[in-house]
């Protein structure tokens, strides 16, 4: 019951921030927020985390894209952004660059993503604040409950009933690659004092804004964006039923995993009730449950768990559930 109440309060904040902030007088925003709240209430009442959370996040992604593109056309008449507009901080702050931004900010006092610092619901300060709140509450749960980009993979991964390619045996390798990529992005961003991920690797440029193509490097970057979107957001989630981009290329997701010890809520596996059927491992969208996780009776998923609840729904023994982390709650108290 306590976890349910906590989730309800938390999601009300999320729905307000992404659905209503800055547009309280918009009928569309009110309808959108009401629909999202309805989905969340249905999820709590039925305990069907799998179905309603998926619809919730997919809807969040699609409507965010529509709203964001509409704002871009109202403000500058195009989805493309020029170098001058970017340097003048005429773009919202993107949470994905947070891990690459923190080290240069701490060492050189340089903000490598030139967004508005304050005075906007998606300014640097407001996004860092919401990130901090999420980190100490649900940690990497951001990826499955809050991220308006991850909904694209979520929706695509739901289309096939069964995975055409099984990657369970490669879970450890995929996790290792994601952390290695995070280290690479952080190191190069510090060395160049630029948002390398945003400039070269972000597949979601197709759903938000992209750099105006004026030279060969920008053209090459655009081709990379398209390839990554098609490959990691569309094709691989469809073939594997996994959140593939989230599990391999997203630096923010990897960074949230490293911050996981600070979060108050996690997933608990009752090892006494578990029959080791591996249905939870097959259902996990983030490659966070291995054969060894179950065989070794660890009692919880691996560090990349995004608390999506897929394992809870999949478990026939009802041996998995959300739970407060006693160690974290004890430190807070």
Features from the language model and the residues they span:
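Non-ligating segments of multi-cofactor redox enzymes
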Residues: 1-282, 287-294, 303, 313, ...
